[in-house]
């Protein structure tokens, strides 16, 4: 067994993974795991008490994490004319209209988030089979269909993320880097939880935050007590 493997085993033996921990305890466990050669992303996986097959129980939105994600985003903007110039001036990495639509239709996709002005959505909508599975399709709910491209790009750079429940009713999101101070990660996660709670569909009944797991790229998944999160 490698030295790394022995150390992580020793750390994890101290914890009972059949129980749920407080959010701060879960973050502390991840931070005690041996380092790797890159700054790991901290992810959360949240099982929601919804029926995503029902149109009135689908969840999608966006939230600005107070301490950002630690990730440098590649931002693509579908826009023409003055709005295209505005997007370039605001620091978008890729800007175009029909030419960009054709490029993506040809198989090119090299961005982390896509933004579009409303007038472009007729053409962008045709890219559903390419952008949809990658969670890159601009939507009004996520704030990525907008005329204010400058503001949207600035928000994305500062840490605005999209959240969405998948077909199993699970929301997955990156909430920062393991190098972040623990209290910064905690505040980011609490901000996301607050946004999810506010987005709870009226039709959803029973327990809303069913389960909550926090993990790092190379670390274990730690179960977090959802009662604390509902109260935060």
UniProtKB/Swiss-Prot annotation:
CDD domains in alphabetical order: Ribosomal_L1
Keyword annotations from UniProtKB, A to Z: Repressor, Ribonucleoprotein, Ribosomal protein, RNA-binding, rRNA-binding, Translation regulation, tRNA-binding
GO function terms (MF aspect): rRNA binding; structural constituent of ribosome; tRNA binding
Cross-referenced InterPro entries: Ribosom_uL1_bac-type, Ribosomal_uL1, Ribosomal_uL1-like, Ribosomal_uL1/biogenesis, Ribosomal_uL1_3-a/b-sand, Ribosomal_uL1_CS
UniProt entry tagged with the keyword Ribonucleoprotein: yes
Listed GO CC annotations: large ribosomal subunit
Biological process, per Gene Ontology: regulation of translation; translation
Similarity field: Belongs to the universal ribosomal protein uL1 family.
Role of this protein: Binds directly to 23S rRNA. The L1 stalk is quite mobile in the ribosome, and is involved in E site tRNA release.
Record note on quaternary structure: Part of the 50S ribosomal subunit.
Protein name per UniProt: Large ribosomal subunit protein uL1
